[in-house]
Amino acid sequence: MSQTPEARARDNQTRQIQESVNNVEKHFGELCQIFAGYVRKTARLRDKADLLVREVNTYADTETPTVKLGLKNFADELAKLQDYRQAEVERLESRVVEPLKSYGSIIKLKREDLKVTLTARNREAKQMAQLEKTRQRNPSDRQIISQAETELQRATMDASRISQQLEETIDNFEKQKMKDIKKLFTEFVSIEMVFHGKALEVLTAAYQHIQDIDEEEDLEVFRNSLHPPDFQSRLDIVRANSRTGSTSRGPSVISQPPGNRQKNRIEDEDEEEEDDENSTEDEN
């Protein structure tokens, strides 16, 4: 005995519902994995940026004044950006990834509904086959045939009722799925817009801090660091003394102690007396 048109329609309906559930399970699962990976990579980017902030601060401590100030302010802005990125990660996790994960349990419930429907359909098909077999074996036994017809009628009514319930359930499922799709992607775009809006503000400030670095001033500081003030003052004193010595240089007079000067004078007088005696002897 072939299926009735109503049974064939219910089978086609169940098959279509099953394909729809399979489709949602496949693509929502893929979306969930991809969004989760997106969040993980964003979190890793936040961690790398934290390392960058730390290194910029460390390097800034070794630099000249305006470079140091510019880098410190830049690092502060970059750290602020990571706070916004952390908020982005948390919002994506709670508003996008988690709702997608919840579809795992939703799909499981729909499969159970489909299983109940298929069981009812199989029971109907079994009763229909039983009735056909009874008619062939006992065509004159109206009691057995009537009982088989009653069982088939009951199975058909159950299958019809369960199919109606499944149709209503899947209709609600599709309605909720469409709302969730709209909400999930709206949340994703909104979260990204908020983050990138804040990022533009923060990065603009960071850019300005770098532009505020005074290269000429810091270059002068660096040059002065090559000639410290103490070294320069000593160098100036040496140069000044050198110039003074060259202009005041003249004949040198060797000073003698008083004792030496008296001794020399006595020796000179003795020499003069000897000269006088010699000259007198020559005259005689």
Swiss-Prot record:
It comes from the Eukaryota. Disulfide bonds: none annotated. It is a peripheral membrane protein. Residues 267-284 have a biased composition (Acidic residues). InterPro entries: AH/BAR_dom_sf, BAR_CBAR1/2, CBAR/FAM92. Keywords: Cell projection, Cilium, Cilium biogenesis/degradation, Coiled coil, Cytoplasm, Cytoskeleton, Differentiation, Flagellum, Membrane, Mitochondrion, Mitochondrion inner membrane, Nucleus, Spermatogenesis, Transit peptide. GO terms for cellular component: centriole; ciliary basal body; ciliary base; ciliary transition zone; cilium; cytoplasm; mitochondrial inner membrane; nucleus. Residues 11-221 are annotated as: BAR-like. It holds the Pfam family FAM92. Plays a critical role in regulating mitochondrial ultrastructure and function by maintaining the integrity of mitochondrial morphology, particularly the organization of cristae. Plays a crucial role in ciliogenesis. Plays a key role in the correct positioning of the annulus, a septin-based ring structure in the sperm flagellum, serving both as a physical barrier and a membrane diffusion barrier that separates the midpiece (MP) from the principal piece (PP). This is CBY1-interacting BAR domain-containing protein 1-A. It comes from Xenopus laevis (African clawed frog).
